[in-house]
Amino acid sequence: MRTAAHTVSTPLQGGYVGRTITHAPAWGGLVTWDMLFNGISTGLFLVAAICDLAAPSIFARAAGAAFALALLFLVVDLASLVFDLGDPLRFHHMLRVVKLGSPMSVGTWCLTLYSLPLTVAAATGVLPSEWMSLEAVRRVAIVVGLPFALGSAVYKGVLLSTSAQPGWKDARWLGGYLTSSAITLGGAGMLTLSLLMGEGRAVAALRFALGILVTVNLIPLGLLVADVRVALARAYRLPGLFGLAAVCLGGGALLPFYLLVVNDITGLLVVAALCIALAGLAIRFAIVRLPHASS
């Protein structure tokens, strides 16, 4: 009796070496805005906190407004994050355990713990100033919130760079860039608030500081670009790469630096801050797009 022949599948020559076997996440504009709002909120808090602790006579008024604005951006950021997860309960489920070895768990807890002192710091700005104990409460809240704000700023970069997604897995400087960018965005936000509130001494100090931040931010950005240069070459044609470089380097660094250093017109200083934010958005969009270029 003739036996049926068994079909044996032959593995691909060379196996899976050099092959992409992951599926790109179904992320788009929402997660890009989530990353931007996270950077603005944490950066505003970090810059305002340091300014308020170092020179309250100069920055206290603008810092109070910055804490309230940072809380608003955090609420929008968390809403974007929850909608991006698809199920609002998923964020809640991540709070049931603490895994110090998991960037997702650490980041979720940092966001939660950051929101508490931020809320206190923002609330003290709207309560009656006659309450003398409020200043002490605000300072304690600021100090307590600093490490959690820093953790919230850095965790998304660490989370993406430890994934298996093409482009992200090579982005070892992503956490460093997002943290540096958050502080730069915070400086731009503080400068804008100081301008709108007529805080001349704060504006003078923040213009100088923001010029330094914009320049220093180019270092982690350059290291990040070096990490993901292969993925960028797959994601963009040459004209697209030049366009992205023009937006990020020209619009996000050179133009703002020029406006900050040689210009005294209030409107143009606001333009400098806006350019920094738009460049940050463009870079985050390019980061989110990297795995899709290899799928």
Q: In which residue ranges do the predicted regions lie?
A:
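Juxtamembrane membrane-interface segments at transmembrane alpha-helix termini
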Residues: 75-80, 106, 183-184, 282-290
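Membrane helical hairpin/interfacial module
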Residues: 44-110
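A cytosolic-side transmembrane-helix exit/cap motif
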Residues: 82-87, 223-232, 286-295
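Long, contiguous internal "core" modules enriched in hydrophobic/ aromatic residues
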Residues: 29, 34-40, 52-59, 63, ...
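Sequence termini and other peripheral, non-core segments
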Residues: 1-2, 278, 282, 286, ...
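An acidic intrinsically disordered interaction segment
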Residues: 2-14, 80, 144-158
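N-terminal signal-anchor module of multipass membrane proteins
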Residues: 1-57, 290
